[in-house]
Swiss-Prot record:
Organism: Alkaliphilus metalliredigens (strain QYMF)
Positions of the record's site feature: Important for substrate specificity: R12, T71, Q154
Main EC class the enzyme belongs to: hydrolase
Name of the protein in its database record: dTTP/UTP pyrophosphatase
Role summary: Nucleoside triphosphate pyrophosphatase that hydrolyzes dTTP and UTP. May have a dual role in cell division arrest and in preventing the incorporation of modified nucleotides into cellular nucleic acids.
Annotated EC: 3.6.1.9
Gene Ontology cellular-component annotations: cytoplasm
Domain of life of the organism encoding this protein: Bacteria
Keyword annotations from UniProtKB, A to Z: Cytoplasm, Hydrolase, Nucleotide metabolism
Catalysed reactions listed for this entry: dTTP + H2O = dTMP + diphosphate + H(+); UTP + H2O = UMP + diphosphate + H(+)
Family membership noted in the UniProt record: Belongs to the Maf family. YhdE subfamily.
InterPro entries: ITPase-like_fam, Maf-like
Amino acid sequence: MERLILASNSPRRKEILQNLHVKFDIIVSDVDEVFNEKDHPAKIVETLAYLKAEDVANRIDRDAIIIGADTIVVKNGIIGKPKNKQDARDILRTLSGDVHEVITGIVVLDTSSGYTVIDHVVTEVYMKKITDEEIERYIATGEPMDKAGAYGIQGRAAVFVEKIVGDYYNVVGLPICKLGEVLHKHFHINLL
């Protein structure tokens, strides 16, 4: 199998690939995650994922398959990572008792040929009504501070999620089903 590189600093993306016992390296991209909020959310995550993969491709000196990804939460606009504890409170109150979308853009880029596949996955997440006391306890853990939407479905915030429609791993940050399909169909790489 060709060298596989994950262009991400996300511990969640790393863990998802490690759980599959896939051999890969990590090279963190230097891309600033700035975007035009007027663009469609799917376009934003696809573009950022591409820029991350391209940045890493331009910095390595041997052939590799590079995976780039970017995840955002959408409810009446884009919800990023909280800037501070008050922002986390506001975000969690916005998501409480309602549905929102989690969109992850993925890019797989072959540095030897330049062949690139760009796609995205959308998952709907239904949150229960979260009390202010629950929000305060959750924020006190520190868990929401580095996550889009101010929550981690794989962590303590699982108690807030009533149901999802779509790929669970997409909400975590790497839609492994779609990634597996892309790697198999376009790059002849099996994750099993």
